[in-house]
Amino acid sequence: EGDLPKVVYPVADEPMVKWVVDAVRAAGVQRIVLVIGYRAEDVQAVFAGDDDLEYVTQHEQLGTGHAVDVCRDCLADFDGDAYVLAGDGPLIRSETLRTMQEVHREHDAAATLATSTIDDPTGYGRIIRNDQGRFEAIIEHKNATDAQRAISEVYPSYALFDAKRLFDELETLAPDSVTGEVYLTEIPARLHRAGHRVEIVDAVPPEDILSINTMDQLAEVDAILRARL
């Protein structure tokens, strides 16, 4: 509600995005890049005085893949692993991020996704595994068959990539023919098909991916965060 950017909305006395950045910091991430757009100054004001953040502007909302791609120049000299996370998920835990990092490095993965198994997966991208239980694809809810919609393991936008491979794939990823947007969720499947290793960590507690789109949901997440303090 209101015209504030969603990520700036306070929950348990802190803007949503502050909870995410704090979890990332606690996980030991060296560089933090925030992609900003609508009312960017409100987001930057949250971190006024913090010198460990970089900002990149996404002038048009052309999808999650595009939001990452606008960081290409900023990270041109970066040769390492990069988390890609949403700014409106304040329940994210640093322990989850560290677990992803351990698995990613242990298996020398091109991508590592943290997933959650939930009772009502409506709206979330489903994780498709092959007969051996290995990652195959993320299927967006709207594109899923009835059988795929019955899958309860979902992708809550927790990803860790080899940054060079991520940007290489984005370079050749075409926009969706219907929406014109570029979807980050296509990248893990492309890496898998190219023979790169994609790991899955079923490590996200269901409560951590609660959506905040109504005041009731905001109150629920607020209570969970306060109970953790």
Segments (PLM) and residue ranges:
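Catalytic-core segments of class I nucleotidyltransferases/pyrophosphorylases
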Residues: 135-208, 215-227
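Structural beta-sheet core signal
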Residues: 33-34, 83-84, 111-114, 200
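Short aromatic/basic micro-patch
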Residues: 10, 91, 160, 211-212
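N-terminal nucleotide-binding beta1-loop-alpha1 segment
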Residues: 1-3, 32
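His/Asp/Glu-rich metal-coordinating catalytic cores
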Residues: 82, 87, 95, 114, ...
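A short, conserved acidic/glycine-rich loop-to-beta-strand motif
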Residues: 106-117, 125, 136
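Conserved beta-strand segments of alpha/beta enzyme cores
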Residues: 7, 52-54, 134, 197-199
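Conserved N-terminal catalytic core of the sugar/cofactor nucleotidyltransferase
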Residues: 10, 14-85, 91-102, 106
